[in-house]
Amino acid sequence: MFPLNDLSLKTQPVQLNKVTSNTESTIKQHELVSDDAIINELSSELVSCLGNGKFTPISEDSKLFNMLSEFKLLHSEYFEWGDYSLWFQDFSIYNKIGFIMIEKIRELVTHPFGIN
């Protein structure tokens, strides 16, 4: 038997419950946010920094930088993340022109006769 006044025994279950509840809430948060919702949020962030003829530099600790860091660089202007492609085309910081395209990649459906 353990003594009832042992402090380590009293605090251990509380810490375990705290970790468990944090893990559960994190899992619930991830389940509620779809890829489409994340892309919509990314679009809003891009427009706020680069849209309407303005160019706001992006700091390394910004929300937009963190979101863009999830994309995999495949070419100097082309990034991918899950089912999405992100294109920065003809973008120039000097004359502040160009465009950004976010595209959702669709699965190809193969028909029985090989027609796509």
Curated annotation (Swiss-Prot):
Protein name: Uncharacterized protein YedM
Xref: Pfam families: DUF5503
InterPro entries documented for this protein: DUF5503 (IPR020484)
